[in-house]
Amino acid sequence: MKRRAWATRKVGGFVDQWTETHTGCGTPKAVGGLVQELLGQSAARQFDASTQQIEAWEESVRVVGEALSEVASRVAGARDWSVLFEYSIPRREIRPDVVILGSGFVVPIEMKVGATTYSRADWLQAEDYGKDLEDFHEETSGLVVVPVLCATAAPLSDVDLAVRPSTSRVQLVNADRLGSVLTEVHSQFGTNFPIDCDRWDQSRYRPTPGIVETALDVFGGQQVREISHAYADNLTATVDELRRVITQARERSERVVCFVTGVPGSGKTLAGLSAVHQ
């Protein structure tokens, strides 16, 4: 089966190569070899890598190399972790720049080389990586997901590893802080069982439970009025109209498609779940 990641490395081998070739100047072989592999994959996948993209890869590999060298010196078992570059999440058409497979946890990383701030758009992108892996990636089921936005030149930011429910909030780090955050993630969520990189890389697409099961989980005996205070004022009216249309379609043995529109956060999903549940 074709790999989804454009390049993968065991952390131990990657760190050894990094340590042997890194001199603090120029481009270490560990960087050059990975970038050449990424270039080969980009050509094979008909992706036109610009000069800017190549430079971003070079700097990303440098940052990750420094971070993992730090982690390997602090965390027993970290050499058995894996690092993947440009991983294509099944059917989601998005690629985290880097994914770290630790022992019991997954860290998708959005790399922003040279960025001096943590933009909301980048934050949302990192959050999407975490949600997509949790909701659609079979081999990530049961693992803790910690999405990271690494703006390499940005100021330090606080770390908050509270998990809700199995994916933490996005961690904001710069190049100097990435290694320490990975160490903290292991300290809080690490197990003694490293993730099988090949199996994870080739994971099947596994969507979230069907809408009926989700509705049952969400409502749990509650009525829409009891949990809709944060949504649109006309949510109840919307649900009532959906139910009216559904009832009419049943009575007439018709098939009907209903389209519910609204701004983000207005309660469209909740309206659909409520209509199905009731």
Model-derived regions: residue spans:
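Accessory nucleic-acid engagement/destabilization modules that flank
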Residues: 1-212
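Short glycine/proline-rich turn/loop motifs
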Residues: 218-227, 254-255
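Dynamic helix-loop-helix/coil hinge segments at AAA+ ATPase domain boundaries and subdomain interfaces
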Residues: 224-237
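Non-catalytic interaction surface on structured domains
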Residues: 235, 264-265, 275
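Pre-Walker A adenine-sensing motif
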Residues: 236-252, 273
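Walker A/P-loop nucleotide-binding motif
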Residues: 257-269
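Motif I (Walker A/P-loop) of helicase-class P-loop NTPases
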Residues: 269-277
